[in-house]
Swiss-Prot record:
Residues 1-19 form the signal peptide. One of its GO terms (cellular component) is extracellular region. It is found in: Secreted. Keywords: Antimicrobial, Disulfide bond, Fungicide, Plant defense, Secreted, Signal. This is Putative defensin-like protein 27. Disulfide bonds join C36-C74, C46-C65, C51-C70, C55-C72. InterPro entries: Defensin-like_20-28.
Length: 74
């Protein structure tokens, strides 16, 4: 029979692993590299149509021009 302590630690390790792998997690390693919820001055000249299309490559809600800078929705 499997020891209950082993099951608890396996469950805990799996939970931590899934928390780190989830893109929306606060523990995510690629939070700064995310398109969503960020301004992107590297995009260049901003038009709402082109900014929205560019943001849809990594965000489900698209984006808009915020003070002449492309901003992707959260």
């Amino acid at each position: 029979m499997v020891h209950p302590r082993f099951v608890f630690f396996a469950f805990l390790a799996l939970s931590v692993l899934l928390a780190v792998m989830n893109e929306d997690s606060i523990l995510s390693s690629n939070k700064g590299d995310s398109l969503c919820c960020n301004d992107h001055p590297e995009f260049g000249i901003c038009t709402n149509k082109s900014c929205n299309k560019w943001c849809l490559q990594g965000c489900t809600r698209g984006g808009f021009c915020k003070r002449k800078i492309c901003h992707c929705y959260c």
